[in-house]
A protein has these predicted regions:
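Conserved PLP-binding catalytic core of the aspartate aminotransferase-like
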Residues: 287-317
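Conserved N-terminal alpha-helix of the aminotransferase class I/II PLP-enzyme fold
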Residues: 23-72, 91, 95-101
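Active-site C-terminal subdomain of aminotransferase-like
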Residues: 15-16, 193-279, 283
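N-terminal "arm"/small-domain region of PLP-dependent enzymes with the aminotransferase-like
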Residues: 1-34
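Active-site phosphate-binding strand-loop segment of PLP-dependent enzymes
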Residues: 117-174
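Conserved PLP-anchoring active-site segment centered on the Schiff-base-forming lysine
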Residues: 78-94
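Conserved active-site segment immediately N-terminal to the catalytic lysine
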Residues: 181-193
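PLP-dependent enzyme catalytic core of the Aspartate aminotransferase-like
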Residues: 1, 330, 334-377
């Protein structure tokens, strides 16, 4: 495991390179000096360029976890007197709805179970029935289960209906294919510490410039999280509040490392990581709970084997240097999650499978082969 004390199999913060971590140890820098603003601009430019967003998009940075960027987009984008349609098929879709309600924004939801991608026709029907809806909010990769929602199709539906889309791409941007400049998309939120392989503490909103500039005359719902305030200040090489200076320095290093690896190669590495993990876990008898077509290449939810509890399995894996992740919500009692983002390689994932096998042997759990693609509750 070389420079890593733990192999992190949680969906962020992910394992990082020594050079990203070393970037945190920089000379002290005042956040209102030109050197800091130049770093902010380089990070903003790098994010939009590497995301393939184009010149009519920009990035707005926030000091905070990923949820800060989601809340900034939602509380800023919805005009007074309008409503938001939230796709809810997991914990993070539900969180988007709770954010909107906390700001007094009327919310309509379209739901599916946490193992099923949303049907775009359900979004279309909801938009047709509710003319007061101005925006659709959808999580691209629901890390509740490792489910991918069809963002491109939802964006097309919204565009046909004259509505705009907010995407939570927290755990998919730079790890799954996502066309940022698709018709209908206005705001895409993410953070530094997932597929970007940076350090927690900075999140961002990729914004269509015309959409964020349209917020200029809007009365803000939030002091700290008003999207246009941050955009306008950052455009002028300024900041309304103190940014996470050292974390931004690490973000700049993470962007440089993504550029060197190449986005296509990173996505391919994650996909191969997932394949090695899933094939190996199937050989141990673990069942994947999300069917193939809607499954991400970043996280897998497995059913616990008979006689096995999560806490016991977690502790056995931790003794071997691996941190797995509990199921969320209703599935916590019978499922657990394994992510393969970050600096992990297929060789690492092979070692993960061997650690699971060794843990099961220690715990006296029978190992047997099952299909990798079945799901029955």
């Amino acid at each position: 495991m070389a420079d890593r004390e733990w192999i992190l199999l949680n969906p962020g913060p992910a394992n990082t390179t020594p050079t990203v971590r070393a970037a945190l140890v920089m000379p002290d820098l005042c956040h209102r000096e030109p050197e800091c603003f130049e770093m902010v601009r380089r990070c903003r430019d790098g994010l939009t360029r590497l995301a393939g967003a184009g010149n009519d998009w920009t990035a707005v940075l926030f000091a905070g976890s990923g949820t800060a960027s989601v809340e900034a987009a939602i509380c800023s984008a919805i005009p007074p007197g309008r409503a938001i349609l939230v796709v809810d098929n997991g914990v993070y879709g539900d969180r988007m709805a709770r954010i909107a309600r906390a700001h007094g924004i009327p919310v309509e939801t379209v739901r599916a179970d946490m193992f099923t991608p949303i049907d775009p026709s359900a979004v279309d029907a909801a938009l047709g029935a509710r003319p007061e809806i101005s925006h659709v909010a959808v999580v691209h990769h629901e890390t509740t289960t490792g489910l991918l929602n069809p963002v491109a199709e939802i964006a097309k539906v919204a565009a046909r209906r004259g509505r705009r889309v907010i995407v939570d791409a927290m755990s998919s941007l730079f790890g799954e294919r996502l066309t940022i400049a698709a018709d209908g998309l206005d705001f895409v939120t993410a953070s530094a510490n997932k597929c970007l392989q940076g350090i927690p503490g900075v999140s961002f909103v990729l914004c269509r410039r015309s959409a964020v500039e349209a917020l200029a005359d809007r009365s803000p719902r939030s002091v700290y999280l008003d999207l246009h305030t941050h955009y306008a200040q950052q455009e002028r090489d300024n900041t309304p509040f103190t940014p996470a200076v050292q974390v931004l320095h690490a973000l700049e290093q993470a962007l440089a490392e993504l550029e060197r690896e190449g986005l296509d190669r990173r996505i391919a590495r994650y996909a191969e990581n997932a394949r090695v993990l899933r094939d190996g876990m199937a050989g141990l008898g673990f069942e994947i709970l999300v069917a193939g077509p809607g499954r991400s290449n970043i996280l897998t939810t497995f059913r616990l084997l008979p006689g096995l509890t999560y806490d016991v399995l977690h502790d056995a894996m931790k003794r071997r240097g691996y941190i797995i992740y509990a199921g969320q919500g209703d599935i916590r009692t019978y499922a657990f999650r394994v992510s393969n983002m970050g600096t992990l390689t297929p060789a690492d994932m092979n070692a993960v499978v061997h650690a699971f096998a060794d843990s099961l042997k220690e715990l006296g759990i029978e190992v047997g082969h099952r299909s990798v693609s079945t799901r029955q509750k």
